[in-house]
Regions:
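Conserved active-site motif detector
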Residues: 1-212
Length: 212
């Protein structure tokens, strides 16, 4: 059995309507997500599922099949949201993104879960560590009890015409949302207060401009 597998992989949304989940506060950059493997009429499909059991998107057939093979070997699979993008063409446009996909042997679950937590933290800050690691690097993860992290970086894909990067890191509000998730009610209330104040400021600004 392989001990480790890691890469960045593009995923797509089923429709623009389904992209609401991807753009919402339930899906943050750096979130650790579940990968659900299905088979439909002989075609492998790997779905990215967020912490709230909502579907974020899906991987292409070839990569889905590769993940199915890793799962058959016994590897645990996770997907970490790296960025969200929108492309204008083909019309009416498409929401998509990339996830850091990691597979690991459950024999080293403690070490790799700690490693994944570290990767999530970096990605949440907009830092994309290299994940295609060789044997010695995998040994570093295990021997350090998961505290070792790659120093090499993976650049964002080059922007094309008509392409916009919508989420690449966590912002201030995202930090408050995450604190609210973990039970910090004060941060949760503060996040809503901030949003309401922002909306109020926009309305006041529009009124002062004579919009309504």
């Amino acid at each position: 059995m392989e001990r480790y597998f890691g890469t960045y992989q593009t995923f797509r949304t089923v429709s623009k309507k389904d992209a609401a989940v991807l753009m919402g506060s339930n899906t943050l950059v750096g979130d650790r997500n579940r990968i659900n493997l299905t088979m439909d009429e002989g075609v492998h499909r790997a779905w990215l599922i967020n912490k709230f059991n909502e579907t974020i998107g899906y991987f292409d057939d070839g990569f889905s099949r590769e993940l199915s093979l890793f799962a058959a070997e016994g590897l645990e699979l996770v997907g970490i949201l790296s960025f969200v993008a929108f492309t204008e063409t083909p019309e009416p446009g498409e929401y998509w993104g990339q996830a850091a996909v990691i597979g690991y042997s459950p024999h080293y679950a403690e070490e790799f879960n700690r490693f994944i937590d570290g990767v999530c933290g970096l990605i949440g800050k907009g830092i994309r560590p290299k994940l295609a690691l060789n044997g010695p690097a995998v040994d570093e993860i295990i021997n350090s009890n998961g505290t070792w992290l790659p120093s090499e970086r993976e650049p964002l894909p080059e922007k094309q015409r008509g392409m916009a990067l919508l989420k690449t890191r966590r912002g201030f509000i995202d930090g408050l949302v995450e604190a609210g998730r973990t039970g910090n009610k004060g941060c949760y209330i503060l996040s809503w207060a901030f949003l309401l104040a922002l909306v109020a400021a926009i309305i006041i600004g529009l009124k002062s401009c004579g919009v309504f």
